Amino acid sequence: MSFRPGARQFFERRGAPLPYDAEVEYLQNTGLTQFINTGIVPDTGFRVNARITPLDVSVGDKWLIGAWNSGARFYPMYMYPVGRWGGGYGGYFQGSTVAVAGTTIEMDVDYTASYQIIKIDGSVVQQFAKSGYSGTSARSVYLFGLNDGSNNVNSFLAQMGATKLWMNGSLVRDFIPVRFANTNNQSEGAMYDRVSGELFRNAGTGAFTIGPDKS
């Protein structure tokens, strides 16, 4: 049986232990070379909700979550221009809400049939018509970066907590950040998906900084 790169499959059985040692507050992309491949290819009807803390807001044209190819572009959590939260779909991008370093927010981005709606802490901050492209991205969404088919994830320094992904109203990923002991008996950070029962490990290089255990 083969497993998706970056994920380890555990079969949920009644009474079986969870495949991690503790849930933690966040993962941090130290060195900007770590990312999680969610395995979800977005299209219209895609939605993502994440608890995030930007640590470097002096950047622009950088991504925290996204997927791209020449046919369709999904930039749900995007720093554009410098120091502002933005989003984009296809050939249109918009940024207006100032990002504050060290401030934790809950960001929700919903791609409806005609609009991209961005909420921060429950309030709509951007809503604009999608234009330029349509259909699926053909590439799966990354957390902590943009999947453009290369190893350059074009991210910025941030912490990410619980993150959920929907497709057409159905919850397809329910990630919580966790730590577990790897085969070298070292503590490793990963995202555990409560929908599939999979542990999604770093698909890049280096290692995530692991936040404190969640109380």
For each predicted feature, which ranges?
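Enriched but not universal
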Residues: 1-22, 192-215
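Beta-strand-rich, repetitive solenoid scaffolds
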Residues: 4, 66, 76-80, 87, ...
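Extracellular glycan-recognition modules
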Residues: 19-86, 167-172
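Surface-exposed loop/edge segments in extracytoplasmic proteins
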Residues: 72-74, 91-95, 123-128, 170-174
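Short, aromatic/His-centered strand-loop micro-motif at the edge of beta-sheets
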Residues: 84-107
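Localized edge beta-strand/strand-to-loop motifs within extracellular or lumenal beta-rich domains
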Residues: 101-119, 168
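Flexible glycan-contacting loops in extracellular carbohydrate-active proteins
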Residues: 127-159
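Extracellular beta-strand elements of beta-rich domains used
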Residues: 163-165
